[in-house]
Amino acid sequence: MKSFILMVITMVCAISLEAQNKSFYDFNVTTIDGKEFPLSSLKVLVVNVASKCGLTPQYARLQELYDKYKDKNFVIIGFPANNFMGQEPGSNEEIAQFCSLNYDVTFPMMSKISVKGKDMAPLYQWLTQKKQNGKEDAPVQWNFQKFMIDENGNWVGFVAPKESPFSEKIVTWIEE
């Protein structure tokens, strides 16, 4: 019996360590126009976005942040998601057109995914679950929640949806 308990504890620890050793860079994502997007050794701000949300004007500030820091080992990656009151109903093509026409978005936009629920994308499982990222549970509260990933692919933290892309927490982290 003691052997069985020891074996179970060992397996649980191994599974836990495996999840904690997983990096952001271990995931594959697809751009809004259907191309593979390599996650590389940059600081990354991951944001779930929506076109018909009260926070949609954050696209402008995200673009400003991207323009200011894109040459300093930093990128923003937007993930359209329709998880909150149907505020991102469009197709990938419609979302891309909206972002370009209304906010001149040039930071990488990925294909539409789910950021919560049973069909949550694996990347967002890692971003939101301590058992996956090894750091903290951080369920997505609403559109425009921001996750910070360091240049080694490690989860650093998150910023609430209503906080500005230029919040002190984000800017300090980028400039470290």
Language-model features, listed with the residues they occupy:
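Bacterial Sec-dependent N-terminal signal peptides
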Residues: 1-22
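A short, compositionally biased
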Residues: 21-26, 141-142
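A short beta-strand-turn-helix
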Residues: 26-44, 64-69
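Amphipathic alpha-helical repeat scaffolds
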Residues: 31, 48-52
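Sec-exported extracytoplasmic/periplasmic mature domains
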Residues: 51-54, 67-71, 100-104, 128-132, ...
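Structural microenvironment flanking redox-active thiols in thiol-disulfide oxidoreductases
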Residues: 55-120
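Thiol-/selenol-based redox modules, centered on thioredoxin-like
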Residues: 125, 129-176
